[in-house]
Structures are given as structure tokens and as C-alpha cells.
């Protein structure tokens, strides 16, 4: 019997209202580990205690997902379009636009003047990948990377677009990719979560986007598979230290008493989320020892900071976050989700994009090289990209030195490295305007299917029953594994 049905058999009207009357108390206790998960619906969790649900041996055992929030400008970084120099300030042809949907921010513009990239490009590596001058460190490792220049999505605004690429659906309430991985493969370290979220602080904060905790929700999967968010300043997790005057043994006895009460509650109601809560409190207690060790960089040699850059010493920076990614994966964390904000360049590309690239360029190089030197890259899939791309036409004013770019869902670039992808691969092609895909399109569903394949899952069979349906990350529409990307 599914746990949700078992729960329904035991719950009574009195129990229902008793649960509601204790909501504030539960919310306060939940701060031991992070965002409250009591509202997470119970789901099919019969397999949740199994360590591995994979259908075949996967190449990737860990994922580090570096999400550039806002949508990086592909034609300023990776999608070289030299012919656009001849089109400066000319209107984007209607034959290219084809009446496609625009955001409300530019749909009222009388003109759509083309803004060629002001940055120089050069070819790098044996693969000959064109990389913009703002990413000199990334350019050094293109033969270790797999570039997809033909990603596309239907979502044109940030909230649905980020939700879509993280959960496979534009609607909220679905499990994210990290939760699916935790559910399917389980944890490798009982002292750390299987899924950790890090939010890096950008140097430039001109136009940051909201980053909601629902992006690392477990949705209809058991609550234990939700991401645990580490803070970028102060204690990584609230209440990681005991309150003044409360020794560890008192904290231990308190949790033991709480566990007893929760077990009594479970015997009465058979709510599977009660067991999840017990496990979360126990993990929180163990993290009091494991997390300070994780975040203490004193043991790192000077060569580490030479690799990642001096900013790696400063908590909250992208470079520091990248170093923590390696330390987390090294300790067995399955999925590390990083969010780096302020890539939403509606204006002032010249003033903002260089800062963004400086934040991430050397740090990404350091992360890939560090994993490679330690023999971890083959089993760790690193993903870099945003939720959509940018337009070739300028939003607002245009000059030779500066311009803005609106959202563009019909083509954008991501890259991956390690974890079973083929280094030195350049997949997909866009037209001369970087506006439409002309070869080898990759939809988000294909992207998700490929990631699941690298983890050892057949995306059509990796399902969980919820609300009478077999739910899956890739949904019900067609999706395929992009085999050209696989090593």
C-alpha cells in the first residue's frame, strides 16, 4: 500500500485539527535544518529507502550544476556571429523574427536594431570552439567541454523558465533535478545531505533576480530529497552551533526526546513525512560536526587558491562556492546546485557582462582542473548555463560601445564537462543572427533525458506515482537522449 493511502486510513478529524493547531511549533522546529518542508505532500516513497534505483550503470555519480540566473548572452560569449558587424543598427529582418513572441519589455519597441557583439572572439583547442574574450580561462579547457549551442525552451520569463529547466515543468510544486537524483541514487555520506544548494553573490548587483527555495523543493517526492541550502555569510546553516550554555549532550537528549514524540505521532497517524522529519533532525545534529569541517579551508594548500583565484578565500563569492563544490562532492554529496545572479542584461552589457565573467571564469577553470587532477571529473558531471538566451537586437538605446539584450528562449548555449560527456564536442548551430536554430536542436526535455541517462536512468521508466499518474522529470511529451554528447 502507498504511504499516502496508509496515512489516509489512520487520520481522523481530531488528528487533522490537532496537526493544524501545532503548525507554529512545527515551523519553529523546522529551522534546525532550513526551509519548512511540512507542507510537502506525501508521495509514493516505497523505494525511498533503497540506495539505488538506476536501470543501468551510470557514468556520473555526482552533478555540479552552475546556474547563471538571468540568462547569459550567447552571442557575446560562445555563439560567434561575425557577419552581424555588417548589420549594426539595422532592423532585425521580419523573415528572422517570423512573428515570434516577444516580452512586454520590447514588444512595444518601434525598432529592433541589431547589436553586434562588441567583444573579440578566437578559436581555441583542437575542437576549434569560438570563445569570447571575456572568458580567457574557459578558453583554455574547451577540449574538456561539451558545448550545446542549440538549447531551446518555450518559457520567455524568468520564473517559469528557471522552474522549467530545474524541474521539467513551468508550474511550481514539482521535484527539481537534484531531488530526483537524491531519490534515485540515495546518499553516499550519512553526515551530509545528498543534495546541497549554494547561492553565490555576484560582484555586480545591478539587476538580480529572486531565487526561491521552491527551486530545490522535493515536490511530490519524500521531503528528505529536498535540497539543503547553505548560507553565503555567517554560519552555513542556521543553528549549526549550540545556543550559548547548551552543551552537546543536552542538545542530544533534546533531539532524543523529540524523536520519541515523533515516533509516537507516526504510530498514531502513519504519516511518512514524520519519519522524514526524524531523519532530518538526526542529520542536522551530525552536520554540527561535518559542516564546519567542510567549510574550513585552512587545510587547502596555496596552490588551490592559485587555481581558483584569490576570491576563493572570500565566503559567498562564486570562486569560494566553486571550491566548496569540489569539497562537497569529495565528501560524497550527490548533487550540488549553484546559483549565480545578475546575468539579466537588459541594459549596460558593457558595464555588467565583464563583471559576471570575471566572477565565474577562472573559478570554473579551477573547478574542472581540480576535479580532473583528483581523478573525480570522469564521475562528476559539471553543467553551466542559464534559463534562456538573449536577443541579437538591442533593448533600449544602442551605441557601438553599449547595448542591452532582451530574453530569448529560442536558442541559447550551455556547456557540460566530465561525467560521461564527450569533451571537445560542439553540438548544434544557429542562424547568422543567433535567433533561430538551424541544426540539431536540443529541447530542455532532451537535456533532462540526457542527464538522467548519464546517471543510469531510462527517463521513461524513472517514475513515481502521484495523484494516480506515473510522474517523471521529462513529462509526457517526446524527449530523447542526445547520444552525440556522450563519451
PLM region spans:
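Ligand-binding pockets and gating/stacking loops
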Residues: 1-487
Amino acid at each position: 500500500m502507498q504511504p499516502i493511502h496508509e496515512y489516509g486510513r489512520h487520520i481522523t478529524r481530531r488528528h487533522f485539527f490537532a496537526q493544524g493547531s501545532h503548525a507554529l511549533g512545527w515551523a519553529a522546529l523546522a529551522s534546525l535544518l532550513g526551509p519548512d518542508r511540512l507542507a510537502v505532500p506525501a508521495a509514493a516513497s516505497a523505494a525511498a529507502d533503497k540506495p539505488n534505483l538506476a536501470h543501468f550503470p551510470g557514468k556520473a555519480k555526482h552533478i555540479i550544476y552552475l546556474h547563471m540566473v538571468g540568462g547569459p548572452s550567447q552571442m557575446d560569449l560562445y555563439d560567434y556571429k561575425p557577419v552581424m558587424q555588417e548589420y549594426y543598427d539595422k532592423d532585425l529582418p521580419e523573415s528572422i523574427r517570423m512573428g515570434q513572441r516577444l516580452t512586454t519589455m520590447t514588444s512595444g519597441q518601434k525598432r529592433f536594431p541589431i547589436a553586434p557583439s562588441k567583444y573579440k572572439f578566437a578559436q581555441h583547442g583542437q575542437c576549434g570552439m569560438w570563445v569570447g574574450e571575456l572568458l580567457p580561462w574557459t578558453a583554455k579547457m574547451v577540449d574538456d567541454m561539451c558545448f550545446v549551442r542549440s538549447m531551446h525552451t518555450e518559457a520567455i520569463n524568468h520564473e517559469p523558465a528557471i522552474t522549467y529547466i530545474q524541474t521539467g515543468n513551468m508550474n511550481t510544486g514539482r521535484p527539481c533535478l537534484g531531488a530526483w537524483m537524491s531519490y534515485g541514487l540515495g546518499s553516499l555520506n550519512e553526515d551530509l545531505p545528498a543534495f546541497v544548494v549554494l547561492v553565490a553573490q555576484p560582484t555586480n548587483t545591478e539587476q538580480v533576480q529572486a531565487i526561491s527555495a521552491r527551486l530545490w523543493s522535493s515536490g511530490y517526492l519524500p521531503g528528505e530529497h529536498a535540497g539543503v541550502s547553505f548560507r553565503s555569510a555567517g554560519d552555513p546553516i542556521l543553528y549549526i552551533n549550540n545556543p550559548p550554555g547548551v552543551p552537546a549532550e543536552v542538545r542530544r537528549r533534546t533531539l532524543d526526546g523529540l524523536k520519541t514524540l515523533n515516533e509516537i505521532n507516526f504510530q498514531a497517524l502513519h504519516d511518512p513525512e514524520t519519519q522524514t522529519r526524524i531523519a532530518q533532525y538526526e542529520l542536522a545534529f551530525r552536520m554540527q560536526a561535518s559542516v564546519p569541517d567542510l567549510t574550513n579551508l585552512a587545510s587547502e594548500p596555496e596552490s588551490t587558491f592559485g587555481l581558483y583565484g584569490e576570491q576563493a578565500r572570500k565566503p559567498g563569492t562564486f570562486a569560494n562556492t566553486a571550491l566548496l563544490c569540489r569539497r562537497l562532492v569529495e565528501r560524497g554529496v550527490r548533487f550540488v546546485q549553484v546559483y549565480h545572479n545578475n546575468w539579466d542584461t537588459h541594459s549596460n552589457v558593457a558595464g555588467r557582462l565583464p563583471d559576471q565573467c570575471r566572477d565565474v571564469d577562472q573559478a570554473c577553470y579551477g573547478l574542472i582542473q581540480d576535479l580532473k587532477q583528483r581523478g573525480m571529473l570522469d564521475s562528476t558531471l559539471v553543467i553551466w548555463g542559464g534559463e534562456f538566451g538573449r536577443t541579437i537586437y538591442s533593448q533600449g538605446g544602442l551605441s557601438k560601445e553599449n547595448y542591452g539584450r532582451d530574453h530569448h528562449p529560442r536558442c541559447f548555449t550551455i556547456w557540460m564537462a566530465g561525467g560521461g560527456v564527450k569533451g571537445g564536442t560542439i553540438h548544434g548551430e544557429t542562424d547568422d543572427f543567433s535567433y533561430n536554430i538551424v541544426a540539431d536542436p536540443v529541447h530542455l526535455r532532451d537535456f533532462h533525458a540526457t542527464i538522467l541517462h548519464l546517471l543510469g536512468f531510462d527517463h521513461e521508466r524513472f517514475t513515481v506515482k502521484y495523484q494516480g499518474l506515473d510522474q517523471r522529470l521529462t513529462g509526457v511529451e517526446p524527449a530523447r537522449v542526445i547520444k552525440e554528447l556522450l563519451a
